[in-house]
Amino acid sequence: MPMSSFKRKIKAIQIKIASPEVIRSWSGGEVKKPETINYRTFKPERDGLFCERIFGPVKDYECACGKYKGKKYEGTVCERCGVRVESREARRKRMGHIELAAPAVHIWYLESIPSVLGTLLNMSTSDLENIIYYGSRRVIERVFIVTDPKDTPFSQGDVIYETEYRIYRKKWDFDVEQAFVVKNPKSPVLSDIDGEVTLKTEKSITGREITWIIVKNITRATHTVLPGMILVVKDGQEVEKGQDLTKEMTIDPVYAPFDGHVEIDELSNTITLKPLTTSKDQPVVFTVPYGAKILVSNGQKVKKGDQITTSTSLPSVKSSISGTVRFGSNLNIRALEDGNFEVLSTGEVYVEQVIEERKYPVFEGALVYVNNGDQVKKGDHLADRFLFEEEYLSATEYKIFESHYPTMFDVEERTENDRPIVVITDIDPEVSKETGLKVGDIVTENEYEAYLQIYPEKIVADAGAQAIKKLLQNLDLEALQAEIEAELKKLPSSSSKAIKLRRRLKMVKDFLKSGNKPEWMVLEVVPVIPPDLRPMIQIEGGRFATTDLNELYRRLINRNNRLKKLLELGAPEIILRNEKRMLQEAVDALIHNGSDSEGKRSRRAVLKDRNGRPLKSLTDLLKGKKGRFRRNLLGKRVDYSGRAVIVVGPNLKIHQCGIPKKMAMELFKPFVLAKLLGEGSSSKTMRKVKKAIIEKEMPEAWEVLEEVIKGSVVLLNRAPTLHRMSIQAFEPKLVEGNAIQLHPVVCPPFNADFDGDQMAVHVPLSAAAQAEARFLMLSRYNIISPAHGKPISLPTQDIIIGSYYLTTVGKEFDSLKEEDVKWKFSSPEEAMLAYHLGFIKLHTPILIKVVINGEEKRIKTTLGRVIFNGILPEDLRDYNRIFDKKQINALVYETFKRHGIDRAADLLDDIKDIGFHYATVSGLTLSLKDLKIPPERDEILRKTWEKVRIIEENYEKGFLTEEQRKSEIIRLWMSVTEEITKLTSKTLAEDPFNPIYMMVNSGARGNIDQVKQLAGIRGLMIKAYDPRSREIKSKIFKGQAIHEALTFDYPVDKNLREGVDILQFFISTYGARKGQVDTAMNTSFAGYLTRRLVDVAQSVTVSEPDCGTHEGIRAMDLIKEGTVVEKMNEFLFGRVLARDVLDPETKEVLKNPETGKEYTRNTMLTDDDANFLASYKKMVDVVRYEEIDITELSLPNMYAEIAEPVGEYEEGTELTWDVVKAAKNEGKYRIKVKVYPVVGTVYAEEEPLYDKKGERQLLVYQEVINEIVAKMLEENGIEKVPVRPDIIVRSPLTCESEYGVCAACYGMDLSNHKIVNVGEAVGIVAAQSIGEPGTQLTMRTFHVGGVMGASDIVSGLTTVEKTFEPYAFLREEKSGGKKEIRKYYGSEAILCEVDGFVKDIATDESGRTVIYIEDYAGNIHAYKVPKRAKVRVEKGQKVLRGETLTSGAIVWWKLLELESEKGVMTAMNLLKIIKNAYVQQGVSIHDKHFEIIFKQMLSMATIVDPGDSDYLPDQLVPLVDIKRFNREILEGNAKVEENRKWVIGKTLAKRIIAETEEGELVELAQKGDEVTEELLKKIIEAGIKEIDVFEKDKVVTYQILPKEPIKYKRRLLSLKKAALNYPGWLSAAAFEETAWVLTAAAIEGKVDPLIGLKENVIVGQLIPAGTGLDVFAGIQVEETPRAAVEEELA
């Protein structure tokens, strides 16, 4: 027999970082190709993204090639195609993987805030990004040129950048000059003058060539010199005019030196003497001097000593001008030993006088256009350029060119370049010491090359993900932990460096604890998710539509394969780098495609499709409303469901609904089939026959359906499902047609009406589900709202009007005397007979005998009232009352309280039947005549317009400002509108049967405000406005009523019955539209509010019957700014007492005289109890003198002091057992005492109690009287005071259950008025109760149509938002570690920090108002009032700690600091504000729901001093965890001595590293060492507080030094923050900031214990609430076939 059980299978879920091995182990094979499906065969490509070999077969139990088909081959791997034969479901589960050609960083760990990689490696995110994406660093630096390389590998002229130069300079000796970079040299080089060109070449200091082009403009004097002359000047020598160029000389004759022949050369003017052939002499040549004669002839033979020439004298040649000597090109000369020159033949010597000269240096590589000696004209081109753009010049070269071309080029002393950067991954320790570099330092590529040249093979640097991977692999986490801990000891705990270090330490510990390896954050392998989770679908036209993921995977595979190919080819590094960067970007895009969530643009390119739409990555699939969490895991679709339009079902019982036959057949098809099959055989043909019976709609099918439906229930749901009453169970009744029929009374909980609303039907399938639906969800048992404990399933509209019509009476009824009544009846039956026979009508006054409370009485009433009372329980009948909406609601509630839920449900059905019947009988219609306009209206309007005219005149004369004018007019019209409203109401009431009056008065539809607009006056209209406008802001600042700024001062003085004119119509449209827009804008906002509330509270369930606490909150009226927001009886209803309630006078437990109920601890308070306790007051003595007998065993049960000295105790000492002991020692048996009965009671008068002079308040309403106050009363001669008991009730706020709340602190389950059951999901109920009206708040504007005076919704919602997000409206600025509020709306409210009195309110020298408070001890406390704030107190007023002294917003953390541990005062202040917002809108919600939300908002604390925990200062930690940690520390500290003995002889499970006094890290012990006493002593001296040892193969941690507990401060969180800080990672991830939550959880290896509801829904098991509790897990529900049951019954 089938069983259904409630067992939950998953205990907890852990998340970790996947290692490459784990990813490969998940995979069914490597995806090598980017192809998906073959376009011809439509089969998946082998090794592609849809490969069957990797992911499983496309067809069930069939391999790709078709060799193996059918289930019998399951598990076989086809040898042809390699596909395993299995179910195609495998394609939803089996994963693949991609082996990356180069590592890629997981983007989540880089872009998280704070960056995980950055924190762990101690690097900034920008540096990390630069490394990973092969970025560069912009460097502005000087450049140097090598002038003398000496013994280095440099060459002369090498260019070195400053960064490299600094590195080289430390190790090598070489000379450099600073270089200048040439910019914008002007070209070509032009001659500035006419002249002659001279070219000259020379080498510069850097070994480069400079060509000098010299152009001279000259005057030239020619001087001829003759052979034999001696030149006394050199070429290029400067001479003056008249200076000798040659010597003046006499030349002797020439004689033959030996015998020989003469040869004369006339051309060269020389004589050669050749010796005789016999002689050994050599030939001699003589130049014939100018003017000498030759005495021999050519060929003549001469003897030694013969004269050959005559003597001659040569004059000197003088320079005709001053200038430079230039030898002519034809000049033939011979240098003499004395440095002069002998002229050998006639030639020219020039003297040049330079008029102008220009020099043009040209750098090597430039093209020179001229040659030596060329004549050039001014403007002629000499060279194409003198310098090249971007040329580097040494300082010397720069000077040369600067002097010759002063304005023709610019230079830069520093260059600006983007240098690729690398990170050091390995370095020799000596090199590290020498250079100061360490692993993880970032250097530019140039610097790295410089280091590499100096220290070859001793330093390694790299870029890209592989560099990050190496860094992470190099991390020694244990040593790093010891190093950080040692450094932290030296720093003040609040310093920013310490906080940064603690964050890093936490991460290190997380990695150590979770067993994750840091290098796993860099991917070697990328997992490929199953293909059915990223499907391709064929669309018309033969094309395929595919998921974005496939495109992202495709790009990744393409880039990966390209990189593999390039690596095989040995491509250059620059190409590889680019390809690796693109691969990294492809991996990024797959994981998280898009800019960072915080709005900061990432450096990554966003991958887009053809249409420019960013592709959806894995992160996008998880996060947001459409993500995996919220759409698929938390928002599953439900099978066995249908949906249809709803219509009213007037004949249904409250627990029934009408389901269309067709729909029922479809929903219950399996059950019908089972029943049909159960009777016959189950062969295939039979099955087909049965199916046909259903599909052909044969009568047998309907009969079986009727049977199947009998006794089962279905669930009806109407969207939006705002609270649990939006899903209720009903018994289905088959109906014709296509619409679901709904009982009219259950419309309010569903918020349904019949204007086209649709509802969904769900069938609970199992017996367990059916039982749960029937007993817990049946609409019959859900007529009481869990939000406020009053009925919610209530009659509306027609039913109300029917009941009202039935019980209403004519005008003359009350004045009619009994003796004048015409008709008298002995019983209701008799009266009915008379009615049916037409003698009387429903409203005819009659006298009739009826039974009231068991007695027969004769009363005056009407038949209608008799009929109506006939359906009521006997004790609730009232024959002289009109039953309108309020009365009926009260009636249903009272019936429920007295007779239970079933009777109340039956009553609702009866009221429905009677209401519909008599609404029909009433013949209710609407006509224009029913709208009675008050006759006085016109006169009132005439007078008002006259008053307006006077105001306008005063304004024009300048007596009023614009604001005053507007304000006066608005006030005037508001009072007139009010007056006309009253008149309209009065006019209508003249006829009790006026249909409009009946509708409004009965509460069936509409209100007097709408009637006023129809028949009275429309009044003032609201403007559309911008809340950010200056006008509004200034009003808020000044604390003025905003509504004046938002109101037209021109009224619509007509009503809708008469119609309005054009202008008034236009004004009306403004307000109407504003209403529509506000509603649209705020509905989504309210939905978001509900969602945050649910997220915060979803884990709060009732976890135990009683946590045992004696703490609680004080019962009181909630008063906000003088307005009572909630009366004490409402506050007390549904609560459990935390302490006994004592009678103020007798101090004994209080007893209710009517019921005899005693109000002891743990008593639950009903409505009646709450009313009794709230109204219980007594006048009690302030003080009494008594003499007590101290031999008795008890002290007085009130506060008492001794009235005479006893031993060392003075008079006025509190009476305690010590005092009694002292009295007994003195031999006394009786002592005089002063008893103060008022101490511990609560002052119960609303008017404060003043002192004798009437200047100072001694007691204020609801103040708890203590002994100090009692003595003040005594001093002021006050004898008796009206007081009530001090009532402390339990509350979720003070509950001490570790998880959730206990039943006693929660109190009554408002939906059934019994103590709440363990397992009830009270958190969700609270969130729904608060959120559901939020949407109501927004939707109410509809019906008022923007009329001024209708309280604006926005205000209500904004208040709610402000309360739940208390910091969203504050601008917090940190200064010196403390948060300061700089600006709030207006100003910050000042809180009183003591109990005391307002001594004075004065102004200081600067003109600021100061409030002086005197406390009970007489100390004065001064409070300066902010400029914009209003003072809320007056002189002599009593103020209590935590009260506000000025207007403005409460700064919650300041209030929290003022109060005790529990945060109750803060919660009560929040409660007042938020209750006020809801009460104004007429919404009732029980306080306990708010308290649960506040409990969650107060569930965290900020760490002040982390002590020996892993937390960081200012970190938010759940209070539960802190308390647990501190408790464990206290227990651990007590065991230290015992542990020290226990660990001796054990084996260490981890090595132990400590810091020496010199600051060095040393290893004290290795893993596996035995713990000796000596080693333990060393460990203790090193300050190590706990060690890990092996115990039976398990690692156990022992504490060996006392630890410090955590010091903390309670925090009030906003809803969003409370939800995000939820301890379970699954729920937090599903809320918001999914990626960050998962990242943090994975690093920690966080375990989600699945405590809350959301987590369990996500993992797909029963929630740990209600029937899902472990208590019920063992229950098995047997599914008994109905036939068997029927047999048994028969």
UniProtKB/Swiss-Prot annotation:
Q: What is the protein name stated in its UniProt record?
A: DNA-directed RNA polymerase subunit beta'
Q: What class of enzyme is it?
A: transferase
Q: Which GO terms describe its cellular component?
A: DNA-directed RNA polymerase complex
Residues given in the record as Zn(2+) 1 binding sites: C63, C65, C78, C81
SMART domains per the record? RPOLA_N
- Gene Ontology molecular function, alphabetical: DNA binding; DNA-directed RNA polymerase activity; magnesium ion binding; zinc ion binding
Q: Which residues are Zn(2+) 2-binding?
A: C1107, C1295, C1302, C1305
Q: Which reaction does it catalyse?
A: RNA(n) + a ribonucleoside 5'-triphosphate = RNA(n+1) + diphosphate
**E.C. no:** 2.7.7.6
Which GO biological process annotations does it have?
A: DNA-templated transcription
Q: What does this protein do?
A: DNA-dependent RNA polymerase catalyzes the transcription of DNA into RNA using the four ribonucleoside triphosphates as substrates.
Q: Which PANTHER family match?
A: DNA-DIRECTED RNA POLYMERASE, DNA-DIRECTED RNA POLYMERASE SUBUNIT BETA
Family (UniProt)? Belongs to the RNA polymerase beta' chain family.
Q: Which domain of life is it from?
A: Bacteria
Name the cofactor(s) required for activity, per the record. Mg(2+); Zn(2+)
Q: Quaternary form?
A: The RNAP catalytic core consists of 2 alpha, 1 beta, 1 beta' and 1 omega subunit. When a sigma factor is associated with the core the holoenzyme is formed, which can initiate transcription.
Q: Which Pfam families match?
A: RNA_pol_Rpb1_1, RNA_pol_Rpb1_2, RNA_pol_Rpb1_3, RNA_pol_Rpb1_4, RNA_pol_Rpb1_5
Q: Which UniProt keywords apply?
A: DNA-directed RNA polymerase, Magnesium, Metal-binding, Nucleotidyltransferase, Transcription, Transferase, Zinc
User: Cofactor binding mode, per the note?
Assistant: Binds 1 Mg(2+) ion per subunit. Binds 2 Zn(2+) ions per subunit.
UniProt-annotated binding residues for Mg(2+): D753, D755, D757
